[in-house]
């Protein structure tokens, strides 16, 4: 049985942000929707687009908050509280500056590392950091003053090709996570490099 009951993809809403690095979490959710044949539908009480599906006998909920990134914790906590999903049963997919393009890693717990979506998620979950994260590497611009503009821009073609391969591997690993557990998925994904 899957330890994960809720999979969240972070991003900013609207066409303006759809292809920006900060939306890497939503990119992966869209791939999972194709892989597992589900559609996300807007659900205002959860401030997001949601789906529910059964995979290998496990009921899994998916969420893409439709709030801006810095308010995404509200959507996560609303859905988790409503369905009585514990923080350690949540996987949050997000862009990660500290990993290069072509790398994605799963980990449990930790701080927010300056990521506003994670910062709000931790706060909205009552300062509980025990949720899992699937970190999609986007690289770092090299100067902290450039980070905001960097995450709100599209990756270069070279970076996108690497990110694309990491997203493919992450899609396979989420399938493993649901069917065979988080440890097996973590071991495989954390060893991958495009």
Curated annotation (Swiss-Prot):
EC number: 3.1.1.29
GO cellular component: cytoplasm
Keyword Calcium: no
Annotated site residue numbers, Stabilizes the basic form of H active site to accept a proton: 95
Residues annotated to bind tRNA: 17, 68, 70, 116
Domain of life of the native organism: Bacteria
Pfam families cross-referenced by the UniProt entry: Pept_tRNA_hydro (PF01195)
Any one GO BP annotation for this protein: protein quality control for misfolded or incompletely synthesized proteins
Protein's recorded name: Peptidyl-tRNA hydrolase
UniProt organism field: Pasteurella multocida (strain Pm70)
Name of encoding gene: pth
């Amino acid at each position: 049985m899957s330890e994960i009951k809720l999979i969240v993809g972070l991003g900013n809403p609207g066409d303006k942000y759809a292809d920006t690095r900060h939306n890497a979490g939503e990119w992966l959710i869209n791939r999972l929707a194709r892989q597992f044949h589900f559609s996300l539908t807007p659900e205002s009480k959860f401030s997001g687009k949601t789906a529910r599906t059964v995979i290998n006998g496990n009921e899994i909920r998916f969420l893409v908050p439709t709030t801006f990134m810095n308010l995404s914790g509200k959507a996560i906590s609303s859905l988790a509280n409503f369905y009585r999903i514990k923080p350690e049963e949540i996987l949050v997919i997000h862009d990660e500056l500290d990993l290069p393009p072509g790398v994605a890693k799963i980990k449990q717990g930790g701080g927010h590392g300056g990521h506003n979506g994670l910062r709000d998620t931790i706060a909205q979950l009552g300062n509980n950091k025990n949720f899992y994260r699937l970190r999609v590497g986007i690289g770092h611009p090299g100067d902290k003053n450039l980070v905001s503009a960097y995450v709100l821009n599209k990756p270069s073609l070279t970076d996108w090709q690497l990110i694309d391969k990491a997203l493919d591997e992450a899609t396979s690993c989420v399938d493993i996570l649901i069917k065979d557990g988080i440890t097996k998925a973590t071991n495989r994904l954390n060893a991958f490099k495009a």
